[in-house]
Amino acid sequence: MNIAERLREVSAHYGPVVASVDSFDVIDCQACGFRHIDPLFSEDELRKFYDGEFYESERSDYFAKAEEDKEWWMLRYRHYYEMLEAHARGRRLLDIGSGPGYFLEAGASRGWDVLGFEPSRMACEYTRARGLRVEHGFFTARDARAHGPFDVISLSMVLEHVRDPIGLIEEARSLLVPGGLQLLISPNDFNPLQMTLWKSLGFKPWWVNPKHHLNYFDLESGRRFMTARRFEILHTETSFPLESFLIAGRNYIAQPELGRACHQERKTFESALFAHDPAQMRAFTAQWTAQGIGREFLVLGRKGQS
């Protein structure tokens, strides 16, 4: 990026600084409608990071942990597919940023025609080894168009990693059939429990990690983001509020070894309810959603005719 291009980018993003970590500011960008770091990484820097470093060095234990969590993930994904099947008019699904491919696997087991796009070569190999279709590379509508159109497109834990979330979701939207569904899942950052811990209980904003996350959505900004892209909102929900462990005194930030234990307890709680009492799980989720708390949020939207 030359100096002129950098100046144009800086002038395009403006808003109050809401956090500063590792020489990066997070601004509540009035142009974009969501929080993001400033300055942004270049596209080349991101490609290098996610094609190799992300799984090979930054998250070398990723696949081992994913396999350990697989049963829990498949229960969550059953919940997601039941929601999609209540609204979808067809069963062709594209998962952008498909990671280890468990969402694809869950869909294929239910008779969906599924395809993933994934920037990590290692994750693609891991997915293909189980007989699932995945394209290696950063998603573009041009590359995906030969496989489309799609009835559902999933963007799960992706928007926080990309330079241009608006451009990405506009490209995804162009591949949806009229009335198609966009599923958006992202970390619920700067949520009320996090803000209490930061502003009142002496914690730093630990969720701000500029090397991994460029953008910081919460439930409300995620909903606005989808509405601004001309999606009719069909459903929103949040997930288990992991920050409740911190408020209860289990400081997994200062003691990382507690983190896996807390995660295991979350899995046990959710798995029992997803498997045996999904109505009760939905009731808990509705309460968390109403308060804007929960570690992740989900927005499901329908594309209009235009």
What does each model-found stretch correspond to?
Residues 176-182:
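Short glycine-dipeptide loop
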Residues 1-156, 165-171, 238, 259-274, ...:
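Conserved N-terminal segment of class I S-adenosyl-L-methionine
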Residues 185-215, 220-225, 250-251:
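Short, glycine-/aromatic-enriched active-site segment of Class I SAM-dependent methyltransferases
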Residues 156-163, 185:
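Short catalytic micro-motifs in class I SAM-dependent methyltransferases
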Residues 234-265:
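Conserved catalytic loop of SAM-dependent methyltransferase domains
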Residues 219-239, 274-275:
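A SAM-dependent methyltransferase catalytic signature shared across enzymes that methylate proteins
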Residues 167-172, 221, 225:
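Short, conserved SAM-binding segment of the class I
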